[in-house]
Amino acid sequence: KELYGITTIMNYSGMEEMMKVQAVTDVGRERSVNQDYVYYSLTETGSLPNLFLVADGMGGHKAGDMASRYTVETFVSLVQDSTLKDPVSIINNAVTQVNRRLLQKAAESEDYEGMGTTLVAATVYDNILRVANVGDSRLYILGNEITQITRDHSLVEEMVSMGEINREQTRNHEKKNIITRAIGG
């Protein structure tokens, strides 16, 4: 199984010289296990000057917590070992490879069958933000205002794009948690 349209790469010029990073995860009200996994480094990771990752295991599927942890740890390893120099190529390659590896891992055991996760990967290289996202985890930039950078890969986002519902209706829509792309799954 290959990802279709695996990434959305965006250039966001004018990043501040000084970045502040904060990561907070929360198990939420409906789950007993936190399926979020976060990694960030403000120093070099492989050929990238910095790296930011967020993965959220797919709730309702097996081993979502394992899928998010495995995805982030494997992604970091792939970036560290990459011989590529272009940041977009490095990120694209890591997304493709981590998807393949997670699918292989899922095939090893019934306990992992169907496991998957969302992923946001970002780096600031030459003062330009490069972002890849799969699923409905989001990247925001905080400045004078909060700006959502990524576009959700979800059924309700597609419905908004086609004019079937408006943005406000997505909040309580019965299909709001159906994603159209994932790592693994």
Pin down the residues of each PLM region.
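PP2C/PPM-type serine/threonine phosphatase catalytic domain
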Residues: 2-185
